[in-house]
Amino acid sequence: QRQMCIRDRRYTLIEALPYDRPNTSMADFPLCPECKSEYVSADDRRFHAEPVACPSCGPQLSFVDGRRDTTVAGDSALSAALARLRSGAVVAVKGIGGYHLMCDACDVAAVTLLRQRKFRPDKPLAVMFPLAGDDGLEVVRQYAEPDTAEAELLTSPARPIVLTSKTPRCDLADNIAAGLSEIGAFLPYSPLHQLLLEGFGGPLVATSANISGEPVLTNNDDVESRLGNVADAFLHHDRPIVRPADDPVFRRIASSTRPLRIGRGCAPLELELPWTLPAPVLAAGGHMKGTVALAWDDRVVVSPHIGEMDSPRSLKVFEQVARDLQALYGVTAQTLVRDAHTGYTTHRWAGAQGLPVEDVWHHQAHASAVVAEADLPGQWLVFAWDGVGLGEDGTLWGGEALAGAPGAWRRVASFRPFRLPGGERAGREPWRSAAALHWTSERPWGDCPDNDGLAE
């Protein structure tokens, strides 16, 4: 029952258990007589449907044109947002777990504008498609070729982003996922998105509205103040988002569909442990692409994706998630687990909580995760092809071959150590590692990127 109350979209509106309207962000919207009648009637399909509302008693839309300093409320807000999208503008749209930055997915100039303003020159952008046809994928299939498993995932209640192959005739803006054969596709997951895509009549780029690496923005005032130089306009609603949940991302790997990121609609993710813990544990995660995990008895709950732990806001959201998981599940952690890297924000946070702490080496954690997912006993040889992580010898490790089992790993092969110019920047700029390896081997190497001081 707890899982039913917390998981999926309810995670972003529930304040406390039990899952009743007064304990959600819908408490600010008193039911009108008609909705109240449906809510209290045991024979009605909306009986105790906690978010039930109608245009007269539910959340309202507002549109703010930041470039023209105009505000429109009510039904006209949607029309105003559509007009700006058709004009090639970037519009920030409030969803269930946060805001998206949206623009016309077939307009190269609009996508270029979004990339320039968000300082995101190359990373692929997700595309939201209108629901159409018997299975909802008629428009998707004009641009992509989802297989059966991908189609089922696209239309599932979670509505994740699914990486799927482009069609040869795909005429989306070529700078959405330049040089790639795949596109990150997803369908509308809220009534507002459905109305927006239906009104627009075509696909829209929908990327997280955030400062790069931070958690997705959720507050109306925050998104206007922090992304006023990115979005031309803002489509708000007035239902508070209790906690952020970014879009989940899935892809087919070999014969199975794998989550690359869990989030809105499929988190907190509950997993069964093959053993029983003597006391509750909270795992703080690493520094990049952070999540929080809470484990007790024979289960573990993994939070939605939080982001990089480089900013005060990231730490604030991290602390909220750690606190809320314990409150929502009625479990208080007695031990904290953290990455052994002393420079990580999560490492320092765990050390300041006044609880027993266990350090875990970065690549051993990845190896143990692989074993846990496979659920096969015995000895393993695991190749951890990961970015930078602190190793047991005090150096920064990269691709490692680890033999053994969880709790008893030994490194049996690795790259020869080399100096890493820029430190952990090399994790995001792999050419630095390539240049360093060339220097170490004393072999000729190509030119460094222009305007970079590394060559000097």
Give the ranges of each region predicted by the language model:
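Short glycine-rich phosphate-binding loop at a beta-alpha junction
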Residues: V91-A92, L204, G330-T342, E358
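Short, small-residue-biased leader/transition segments that mark boundaries at the very start
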Residues: R2-I6
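Conserved phosphate-binding catalytic cores of ATP/NTP-utilizing and phosphoryl-transfer enzymes
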Residues: V140-Y143, V216-D221, D247, P268-V281, ...
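A phosphate-binding glycine/aspartate-rich beta-alpha loop in the early core of alpha/beta enzymes
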Residues: G98-K166
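Active-site histidine-anchored catalytic micro-motif
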Residues: V371-L437
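Glycine-rich phosphate-binding loop plus the immediately following alpha-helix
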Residues: V127, G133, H236, E308, ...
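Short cysteine-rich clusters marking metal-coordination/redox-active sites
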Residues: C32-C35, C54
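Internal gly/pro-rich beta-alpha loop/helix module
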Residues: Y19-M26, E38-A42, E198-W275
